[in-house]
Amino acid sequence: MAGAGGGGCPAGGNDFQWCFSQVKGAVDEDVAEADIISTVEFNYSGDLLATGDKGGRVVIFQREQENKGRAHSRGEYNVYSTFQSHEPEFDYLKSLEIEEKINKIRWLPQQNAAHFLLSTNDKTIKLWKISERDKRAEGYNLKDEDGRLRDPFRITALRVPILKPMDLMVEASPRRIFANAHTYHINSISVNSDHETYLSADDLRINLWHLEITDRSFNIVDIKPANMEELTEVITAAEFHPHQCNVFVYSSSKGTIRLCDMRSSALCDRHAKFFEEPEDPSSRSFFSEIISSISDVKFSHSGRYMMTRDYLSVKVWDLNMEGRPVETHQVHEYLRSKLCSLYENDCIFDKFECCWNGSDSAIMTGSYNNFFRMFDRNTRRDVTLEASRENSKPRASLKPRKVCTGGKRKKDEISVDSLDFNKKILHTAWHPMESIIAVAATNNLYIFQDKIN
């Protein structure tokens, strides 16, 4: 049922259940700001899972081989490598601090034994090589094993260095640093399907880079007006098409998505397609423009659809139909009546991400109170689940949660007034081939999988 591609009925139902697998991170009540997870990303095979945090660290988990001796063993994720990707900096020209927080991580397809990933903070993108060493050279002529020079008068024979086995060591080394190309904060990076180029987007510009060239990039989108007082929208997310290397999309704070073709011109100021849903005038309010701002855009694996996340909903668009989305899934419609208080505590500006499962049949996104939502596109069923340590026994099934908006509250329901808005799930990731999901809840990383009966 859950087969390759993470299909089945992942949004719930009698024949499909999600169960707890692992949780990573400290249990502390007082969470240090630096430990808060800011991005989560599986690699192309799903064997590696990377997280970045506000302290500039990247932690990579590797999936262990399945244990045939243990019943229901699916292969757990354990720490593979941890390294400091970015450090805090200071821009002396603008008197601005540059945070070390990792905004995005993107894996490159594996070409050899090593793994490569891109990580970015607000200003600088880095290409990292993750490689293993289990052998070391011994028997040098001029140096001892500890690196000291040998006495030339004691060298009586020529030695041929040999490789000796050693304990496995995982090294993370920065291979490229792409800097000084963004005036504003970088919100997106996306690797092209040609595996040679990638884009980076900030509030007003999108740049195209070659992975081998660090000292120059091409500006492919520039929406900065001559007079900044005329600025009406900013770029919120951007992504390359998974198969067509000339096509990319970017979303805006006005709730629109532009699809651009780099073959048409060097500067993609004119879009090839423009996706926008007409607004219902009767529902317009002070908050309409804020909640329509798109916080994430993701192409489906097939390249036929794209998904956008705004504050209250997830929309699925057919690339051949610009006028309206083919699907709209309400994530937490019960918050519409709370927009005023959410505006006052700044939660209305939270940027939720979204992701597809491997077969594009289901989508997942986060909410408040450590809830996350799943929508099955085939059955139209949806479910609300919770990432909580209270339900963290191995293979414990996740019980669907319900939020009630008023009137009598049933035993298993939670009132909208008692939701904890400090507990929010902004970042989630779905294994590219199996029903395994990773959910970041503050400083904890939860891993869930489909239950094998």
From Swiss-Prot:
Protein name: Serine/threonine-protein phosphatase 2A 55 kDa regulatory subunit B delta isoform
In-chain residues carrying the UniProt-annotated modification Phosphoserine: 285
Compartments, record wording: Cytoplasm
Domain of life per record: Eukaryota
Keywords carried by this UniProt record: Cell cycle, Cell division, Cytoplasm, Mitosis, Phosphoprotein, Repeat, WD repeat
WD repeats: 32-71, 97-138, 181-219, 230-270, 289-327, 344-385, 420-452
Effects seen without this gene: Mice are viable and were born at the expected Mendelian ratio. Mitotic cells display increased chromosome scattering, associated with in the presence of enhanced phosphorylation and perichromosomal loading of Mki67.
Function: Substrate-recognition subunit of protein phosphatase 2A (PP2A) that plays a key role in cell cycle by controlling mitosis entry and exit. Involved in chromosome clustering during late mitosis by mediating dephosphorylation of MKI67. The activity of PP2A complexes containing PPP2R2D (PR55-delta) fluctuate during the cell cycle: the activity is high in interphase and low in mitosis.
GO annotation, cellular component aspect: cytoplasm; protein phosphatase type 2A complex
Lineage, broadest ranks: Eukaryota, Metazoa, Chordata, Craniata, Vertebrata
Assembly and oligomerization: PP2A consists of a common heterodimeric core enzyme, composed of a 36 kDa catalytic subunit (subunit C) and a 65 kDa constant regulatory subunit (PR65 or subunit A), that associates with a variety of regulatory subunits. Proteins that associate with the core dimer include three families of regulatory subunits B (the R2/B/PR55/B55, R3/B''/PR72/PR130/PR59 and R5/B'/B56 families), the 48 kDa variable regulatory subunit, viral proteins, and cell signaling molecules. Interacts with IER5.
Example of a GO biological process term: mitotic cell cycle
GO molecular function: enzyme-substrate adaptor activity; protein phosphatase regulator activity
SUPFAM superfamilies: WD40 repeat-like
Location, primary (coarse class): cytoplasm
Chain positions with Phosphotyrosine modification: 305
Modified residues annotated as Phosphothreonine in this record: 308
Family statement: Belongs to the phosphatase 2A regulatory subunit B family.
